[in-house]
Amino acid sequence: MYTSFDSKQLGTFVADVTDYQQVEAMVKCAVEQFGSLDIMINNAGIGAPKPLLDHDPIADFEPISKVNQNGVYYGILAAGRQFQAQGTPGVILNTSSVYARMASEMTFTYNVSKAAVDMMTKCAALELAPLGIRVCAVAPGRVDTPMLRQYEEIGLWNHIRKEQMRQNFTQPEEIADVVAFLVSEKANCINGCTISASDGFENFKYPLMG
């Protein structure tokens, strides 16, 4: 990325998305560098597989909820306020998951947090529509990232690979292509909904054959 863009096109800002002040400061930094905010992508997310009854109510619920749920809420709020202050339309794109709509073993907190993202997307889209602000979400399935590699460590890598219709993990670049479309003017009619990008993950059960 750094070889493709110069300092006038790309800026960096380290922020803890569980702290609203830091999220707000990130938005202000973008405005100071580029003049305005046009698009906000709330992408930060974490998760760790663990059986529900083995949970520590604090250690296994709060950290995931704070990043996945509070972080998206703070991003929506900070971006929405900036768009309102600018008097300009804008787009807010949240990263959800197929697990927002599906039950699964060992991912209780993650699923709950992503279900919240879907509802925040709907509610924010409704409230912000009069300001010309569009809010939508993308729901990836199994994406080949370091976070997914946790399943290698517990011997489930080949099993989860077969949960895609074509039995291949989605690559991050493929999700980026969907995101680029959703925040573009070509997706102007897409609002208040979550778009699946999962290679059919949620539309079939694990195959008996093959």
Name what the model sees in each region.
Residues 97:
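Residue(s) in the substrate-gating loop at a strand-loop-helix junction
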Residues 81, 126-127, 188:
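Alpha-helical segment proximal to the catalytic Tyr-Lys
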Residues 76, 113, 121:
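Active-site helix of classical SDR
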Residues 103-111, 123:
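Active-site loop-to-helix junction immediately N-terminal to the catalytic Tyr of the SDR YXXXK motif
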Residues 129, 134, 190-192:
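Short, small/polar-rich loop/turn modules that mediate ligand/substrate recognition or access, typified
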